[in-house]
Amino acid sequence: MVRNSEITLEQIFKEGRINLENDDYNCVICSFPLFDGLQCKRGHGACKSCWEKIIGENGKKECHSCRISIKSLDDLSKNLYLEKEIFKQKVACLNNGREKFGNTLVIKSDGGCKRQDIPIEKLLHHIKNECGYLLIDCKYSRDCKYYKQISLEQHQNECQFMSIHCPALCGKKDSRMNINKHLETPNSCKPLISINNSNNSNGNGNGIDDESIIKLSNSIVEIQKSYQNQIKKIKENSESEIAALKDSLYYSKSRIKNLEDEVEELKDRFSTLESMINKLDDSATSRSGTILINGWKMKLKSLDVGHSIVEEQFYIGTNRFYIRIYPFGDSYDNQGYVTVKLGRIDGEEYHLDIGLKVSIKGFDNKKKVLLSYYPGDIAHNIDQLVETWETSKEFKMILHFKVDLKPKIK
C-alpha cells in the first residue's frame, strides 16, 4: 500500500509500482513506463532518467538506437501523443492490498481498495481523496505505527502517544500512555474539587470524604473506558460490514459489466443470424444462373421445332423448377422464336407471379425470344422479348436467367 500522502506520480513510476502490458508505453532501456519520456530527432524514445545517464559524464552522448549525437536534454523533445495515451491507461489502485514477491502475487489478509479501472492521470487524486486506504504516518510520534486514512478517528481514540487530559478531571495533560499509568498509580490523581473540612475532619461539608471522590473519579474512568471499547467494537463491526458491502458492490459492478459484454455479443450474433436469414429468404424467393452451351451451331443442325437443346433443374425454396431451351420454338405456333420454357416439377401448391429474365448470345441472325411458364401442364406465354441481339460468331450459346417468386396480390 502507498504510505505518505505527499507521494507523487513521479515516485510511483520510478518505484515501478505501475506495470503496463503494452511495451510501446515502456522505456526500452529500463522497462519502466515512459512517465517523463523524451525522444531524439528521429523519434527514438526513453525515459528522462535513462537519457540523463546517456548524456552524463560517463555516458556515450548518443541515441541508444540510431546513434545520433545527444549532448543535452535540449536536444530531445516530448512525444505528447504517447504521453497522453499513457495517462489514459487504466490501472488498479496501488492500495489494493496486494504485494508482489518475485513472480508471486500475494493477496494480503487486510484487504484494500477494489478499484481496478483508474486512469493513470486520476490515480493520485483517487489515492489521496477517494481511496481511504492511504497509509498515514502518526503525527504524535515516530514510534507509533502508521494507520489507514479511513481509520483516522479510531487511531485518535487509541494512539498511546496522543496528548489527552486526565478523565478524572485532575487537570493533568500527557500522552494517553502516561495518563493510563497516572490513573493506575494510587494517590497520584487528585481531582480538582474543593474539599471543605470545617464540619468533618475526614470529608467536606456534605459528608463526602476524599476517598469517595477518588472512587467516583475511578468509576468515571472505567465508564469512559467501557464506552470507548464499545465504540471501538461498533466501529470494527461497521468497517467490516462496509468492507463487505464494498466487495459486494465491486463484484456486482463486475457482473454487470460482464452482462453488458454478453448483451453486446448477443447483439452481434443476432445481427449475423438476421443477415443469414435474409440471405436464406433471398434464396427461397429468387434464383439466378448461367447456362452455357458449347457447340451451339452443330447442335442446331440436328434439331427441329419442338426439340429442346438443354434442360437445367434447380430449387427455389421447396419448389423444383426446370428451364428448357427450344432454338426453333416449342411448337409450330411459336415457330420463328427461341422459346425459353420455365416449368415447375414439384413443390408447394400456391399461386405465384413469376419473373423470368434472360439474355442470349450466340445466334447467327437476329431472333426474338418467347418466354413460357408451365405451372402445370398448360403453357402460359408470359413475355415476348421484342429487343434483339447482335450477331455473334462464337460457337457457343450463353443464357443468363433470373427467376423471382412473388406472392400474387389479390
UniProtKB/Swiss-Prot annotation:
Task: Give a yes or no for keyword rRNA processing in this entry.
Answer: no
Zinc fingers (RING-type): give the ranges.
Answer: 27-67
GO CC terms for this protein?
cytoplasm
The GO terms this record gives for MF are: microtubule binding; zinc ion binding
Task: Describe its function.
Answer: Probable adapter protein and signal transducer that links members of the tumor necrosis factor receptor family to different signaling pathways by association with the receptor cytoplasmic domain and kinases.
The similarity comment for this entry is: Belongs to the TNF receptor-associated factor family.
Name-wise, this protein is TNF receptor-associated factor family protein DDB_G0279745
